[in-house]
């Protein structure tokens, strides 16, 4: 079965959740109907996700085969004083993630970024090996641009099943999206809610969002506020539905149960004329990371 038919459209993102929050939100999300839970070794909350999954399984809310669990290996970034992971390092990272998650396999394993310029292909070969031995069902990447993906092609290796990238109306990445679609690489969008005025407001939640962007998001004349009023939905639901209509999988993150419902339970269609208006909102590159856009890594 291809990832396109297997991966749920809406999943739970767990970035910046504590282990305790990850446990609670994983459990509550599964109870609501979520089946995709996304974590990573660098989130340091895989054990919390594991407890949420365990609780859901023990209560009979879901079976393991009904869940789609994603985790990620961080490749190592020499600019941050880290060595680039080798083939064996990646194999070990997956084993450690499986232990923390208390799982025999994960549905999707991603190389978290393209920072390992010397060992990118070696790392990708490790994921293909893990896929062949059944420890992962699908192999993918995150934050890889066309050049990075072309390296895989040039090595005569199969392309990733998916690429998880920052995607929202302010960062639409049309060239990369077209490349992924043309090459049958499924698109997972993260940071879908960047344009909201409420996005990342806590201390330490820094990004490249400018004051002008903040003002635009807060304005009553914001296109997303106007469309939310038109369709009688939440502003966040406009942003999520935009992605779903473009066939992107999404991973909205929240630590509020009410928002878990909002991010999952909505049913409306954005009219084509409004989709075109949203298309005009593109501002260019990524905004999520204070240190820069990972798609610009060499």
Language-model regions: role of each:
Residues 1-67, 193-196, 295-297:
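N-terminal binding-site loop/beta-alpha segment at the start of enzyme catalytic domains
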Residues 2, 50-64, 98-102, 131, ...:
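Acidic (Asp/Glu)-rich catalytic clusters
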Residues 9-20, 73-87:
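Active-site mouth loops of central-metabolism enzymes
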Residues 17-30, 83-101, 147-150:
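Short, acidic/polar
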Residues 35, 104-107, 137, 161:
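Short acidic/polar active-site loop segments enriched in Thr and Asp
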Residues 63-78, 108-109, 143, 167:
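A short, structured active-site edge motif that brings together acidic residues
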Residues 101-118:
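Active-site groove signature of glycoside hydrolases
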Residues 114-298:
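Beta/alpha (TIM)-barrel catalytic core signal, keyed to glycine-rich beta->alpha loops juxtaposed to Asp/Glu
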